[in-house]
């Protein structure tokens, strides 16, 4: 992605919600490489899909020759950003936040190159400059530059102030000052001149721009990426089970892959622009091919492959594809023990059972059938498979060979209704 027209290219992909002084920023980018940053607060032990667009934006800038700084908010994570939140966040302990900082730093690392010469990425933590700052320094050096009038007029704060059931505490009100100071610190320390973030960060970003100008007399810029929405109006990045996480222990690579496979046709080409590094020309060609093929579109598979590889690597992608293929074909011989552990985690419904159970009881316990009587009829109708093999004996008791890896048995009713038995 060429640096000189990088902003235009991001706009073509729909990746720019707002930008401060676009003309001046374009001029600055045309002069040569810049340093830029994006912040990630440790409000959980993993990043989720909502973090992926700004994180990939950092990567896009690095590919164009710029120097990315990934800032993990060890200090701001102790406070909690109130921006557009309906209620105050629960405060977490320092130990918990530090543990989350370490996890998030490790999650961010594979997306950026920390050893590529002049534009090698930097990992920073704002606890380094806030950890030992006393309250008088904070008030005199930072607080004096902020107008309360302007702060309460920021949309994110206004929404909270106008809620009868929820005001805003001083601790959250001060978050804006902390994030603003991050920008000023990174500008002084690393020459950072651009902050990128989600569109909910606009107020915090503009505060940082103002503070940097006041403290260092430097012009800096802000760019926000849009809040990702789906064509049907439902929230992006959520499933019935909650958020889609980047940590494979919280959302398995198989579940992650399936999330993208299930993208609606109305969203898939837009999401290819947001979440992959395919060129606009390649995406348009794929859309044209899908339109004229007369078959199911290929775009969802391309999207699922590209994003799963980005987040979980080639090994995670191959495991996800292997599990998908085995569930579709009914043949489980290619599945490893680790694959079954993914299924047990979140891939299919799971039930724990004691050894010695019969098939009818397993169907009831797994909620594949409402009663033993109904289970008996379904088994007799040849609609049940055990590990891909048909079983039509209602009196069937599980055998040792049904326990794959000594632990797992996969039941299927009909073509699509699965349950994994994990034997105690």
UniProtKB/Swiss-Prot annotation:
Binding site for L-tyrosine: 37, 175, 179
Binding residue positions for ATP: 238
Keywords carried by this UniProt record: Acetylation, Aminoacyl-tRNA synthetase, ATP-binding, Cytoplasm, Ligase, Nucleotide-binding, Protein biosynthesis, RNA-binding
Renumbered ranges of motif 'KMSKS' region: 235-239
Gene3D superfamilies associated with the record: HUPs, RNA-binding S4 domain, Tyrosyl-Transfer RNA Synthetase
Broadest EC class assigned to this enzyme: ligase
UniProt-recorded Gene Ontology molecular function terms: ATP binding; RNA binding; tyrosine-tRNA ligase activity
Modified residues (N6-acetyllysine): 144
Quaternary structure and partners: Homodimer.
Function as written in the Swiss-Prot or TrEMBL entry: Catalyzes the attachment of tyrosine to tRNA(Tyr) in a two-step reaction: tyrosine is first activated by ATP to form Tyr-AMP and then transferred to the acceptor end of tRNA(Tyr).
Family: Belongs to the class-I aminoacyl-tRNA synthetase family. TyrS type 1 subfamily.
NCBIfam families: tyrS
Record's protein name: Tyrosine--tRNA ligase
Provenance organism: Shigella dysenteriae serotype 1 (strain Sd197)
Gene name tied to this protein: tyrS
């Amino acid at each position: 992605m060429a640096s000189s027209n990088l902003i235009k290219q991001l706009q073509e992909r729909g990746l720019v919600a707002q930008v401060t002084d676009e003309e001046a920023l374009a001029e600055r980018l045309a002069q040569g490489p810049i340093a830029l940053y994006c912040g990630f607060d440790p409000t959980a032990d993993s990043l989720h899909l909502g973090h992926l667009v700004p994180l990939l934006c950092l990567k896009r800038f690095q590919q164009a020759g710029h120097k990315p700084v990934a800032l993990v908010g060890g200090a701001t994570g102790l406070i909690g950003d109130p921006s557009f939140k309906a209620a105050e966040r629960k405060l977490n302990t320092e130990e918990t936040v530090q543990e989350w900082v370490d996890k998030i730093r490790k999650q961010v690392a594979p997306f950026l190159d920390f050893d590529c010469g002049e534009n090698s990425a930097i990992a920073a933590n704002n606890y380094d400059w806030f950890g030992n700052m006393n309250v008088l320094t904070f008030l005199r050096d930072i607080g004096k530059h902020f107008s309360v009038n302007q702060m309460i007029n920021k949309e994110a704060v206004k929404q909270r102030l106008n809620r009868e059931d929820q005001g805003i505490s001083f601790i959250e009100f001060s978050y804006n000052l902390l994030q603003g100071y991050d920008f000023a610190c990174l500008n002084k320390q690393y020459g950072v001149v651009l902050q990128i973030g989600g569109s909910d960060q606009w107020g915090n970003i503009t505060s940082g721009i103002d503070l940097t100008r006041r403290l260092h007399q430097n012009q800096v810029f802000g760019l926000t990426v849009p809040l990702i929405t789906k064509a049907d109006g439902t929230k992006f990045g959520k499933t019935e089970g909650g958020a889609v996480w980047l940590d494979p222990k919280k959302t398995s690579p198989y579940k992650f892959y399936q999330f993208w496979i299930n993208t609606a046709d109305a969203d898939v080409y837009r999401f290819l622009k947001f979440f992959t590094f395919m060129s606009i020309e390649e995406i348009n060609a794929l859309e044209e091919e899908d339109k004229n093929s007369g078959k199911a579109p290929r775009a969802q598979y391309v999207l699922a492959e590209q994003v799963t590889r980005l987040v979980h690597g080639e090994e995670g992608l191959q495991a996800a594809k292997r599990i998908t293929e085995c569930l579709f074909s009914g043949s489980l011989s290619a599945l490893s023990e680790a694959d079954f552990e993914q299924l047990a985690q979140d891939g299919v419904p799971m039930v724990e059972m004691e050894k010695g159970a019969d098939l009818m009881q397993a169907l009831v316990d797994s909620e594949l059938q409402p009663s033993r009587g109904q289970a008996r009829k379904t088994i007799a109708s040849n609609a049940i498979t055990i590990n891909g093999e048909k079983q039509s004996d209602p009196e069937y008791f599980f055998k040792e060979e049904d326990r794959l890896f000594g632990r797992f048995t996969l039941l299927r009713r009909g073509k699509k209704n699965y349950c994994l038995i994990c034997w105690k």
